[in-house]
Amino acid sequence: MRLVFGEKDAPYEEARVVVLPVPYDLSLSFLPGARRGPEAILLASRELEPFLLELGAAPEEVGIHAAEPVPWVAGMAEESHRLIREEALKHLRAGKWLVALGGDHSVTHPLVQAHREALGEFSLLHVDAHADLYPEWQGSVYSHASPFYRLLTEGFPLVQVGIRAMDRDSLRLARKRGVALFPAHRIHREGLPLDEILEALGKRVYISLDFDALDPSLMPSVGTPLPGGLSYRQVVDLLEAVFREKEVVGMDFVELSPNGQFHAEMTAAQLVYHAIGLKGLQAGWLSREVDHI
């Protein structure tokens, strides 16, 4: 049985938003299980309240369709990434706004490539505990530790928020390539520098969010948890500012590794649903029923 997001699954022809499960985790280097993340988020989404009090609207009313999971080939990273890119392109060319659910973070590379081919140029907002700027990891350029190195070399402007693990070479590369870096420790000491983040981004933005950006006390179900992460409120405030000021062309949410802690899956589903609502308000697909709550 095909899983859906939330209580209502819009017919594909009527949907504005397509949720694309990408259950690929061939490149994980620590705890396994991210391939089960998309299914866990879809199952948890059944329990969400359709009306979001904070938004004053019900995001499901934009029309959300959950697509079939993208197939992948065990042991064949390059071929699997090609399949991800082609599946994303299919939905983008049909005029859908895409929210992809990983899977490990390597899936971001083919997803971003598909968005560029279909929609043109944009900047990247990468929210994560890890910089993911290794040229390769464990002998593979398709590692979940490498997607943003590859995207940097392909010319994408990059803004990274919430980072708390980064090696010397990655830091040197980030400085050389003009990456705008907003590490978690600075955010905790000084507050979320929204004006600086918005200034560093272009007019059009693709957002990639690794759930380990959140503190493990809130989000324990990730492959590589690190203390000192962002709060749910900080992440929501960041997303709200970006959606308010920029055109968000697409998103992915990655690296949920379900481990029996349902509150983490609910948190992930709620964050995805909130982001869909923000896009609905930005694009004029939704209107606030109630203001100033």
Curated annotation (Swiss-Prot):
Catalyzed chemical reaction(s): N(1)-(3-aminopropyl)agmatine + H2O = urea + spermidine
Entries under PANTHER family matching the protein: ARGINASE/AGMATINASE, GUANIDINO ACID HYDROLASE, MITOCHONDRIAL
Cysteines paired by S-S bonds: none
Other facts noted in the record for this chain: The biosynthetic pathway, by which spermidine is synthesized from agmatine via N1-aminopropylagmatine has been characterized in the hyperthermophilic archaeon Pyrococcus kodakarensis and the thermophilic Gram-negative bacterium Thermus thermophilus.
Site (Important for catalytic activity) residue list: H144
GO molecular function ontology, one term from the record: aminopropylagmatine ureohydrolase activity
Keyword RNA-binding appears in the UniProt entry: no
Domain of life: Bacteria
SUPFAM superfamilies referenced in this protein's UniProt entry, alphabetically: Arginase/deacetylase (SSF52768)
InterPro entries assigned: Agmatinase-rel, Ureohydrolase, Ureohydrolase_dom_sf
Name of the top EC class for this enzyme: hydrolase
Family: Belongs to the arginase family.
Enzyme Commission no: 3.5.3.24
Cofactor info, note text: Binds 2 manganese ions per subunit.
GO biological process, one term: putrescine biosynthetic process from arginine, via agmatine
Signal peptide: none
Annotated residues for binding of Mn(2+) 2: D128, H130, D210, D212
Keyword Manganese: yes
Cofactors named for this entry: Mn(2+)
Organism: Thermus thermophilus (strain ATCC BAA-163 / DSM 7039 / HB27)
NCBIfam families the record matches: agmatinase (TIGR01230)
Role of this protein: Involved in the biosynthesis of polyamines which are thought to support the growth of thermophilic microorganisms under high-temperature conditions. It seems that long-chain and branched-chain of polyamines effectively stabilize DNA and RNA, respectively. Catalyzes the decarboxylation of N1-(3-aminopropyl)agmatine to yield spermidine and urea. Does not act on agmatine.
Pathway recorded for this protein: Amine and polyamine biosynthesis; spermidine biosynthesis
Residue runs in coiled coils: none
Protein name per UniProt: N(1)-aminopropylagmatine ureohydrolase
Residues holding Mn(2+) 1: H105, D128, D132, D210
Keyword set, alphabetical order: Hydrolase, Manganese, Metal-binding, Polyamine biosynthesis, Spermidine biosynthesis
